[in-house]
Amino acid sequence: MRHPLLVDLDSGVMVPCNEDLGLELLTAADGVARFLWLPSERSINGHGVVHGGYIGATCDAAIGYALASRLENAEGFTTVSLSLTYHRPLRRETAEASAQVVRVGRRTAYVEATLRTEGRLVASAVSTLLIL
């Protein structure tokens, strides 16, 4: 049984918060997800770069879709922890978010993500998720 997140994509529907971010899903299969993202003007902070919260939300979205593609019984899940490391500022340019499931246990999962632009690492994230 496919996870509801992925079933909705088959009909062209994306979770509203991801739609608001402007994410374009490239793939979500076998524990891996990839998005393209062009940050909106509204995501730019007072320093002229993308606010870190938008970067975190984008990484979290990739993490969620990667895990959804790995779960076999359409279980729900929620983030327990999300740790971000910012490697360089992101201007308003297209970036690719990718996530890969590292481990799935009976009740928890561990997923890693990166955000890159033109091959350069912008941010990396690690997340622990509770399987409901």
Region locations from a protein language model:
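Terminal targeting signals and extreme-terminal segments of soluble enzymes
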Residues: 1-132
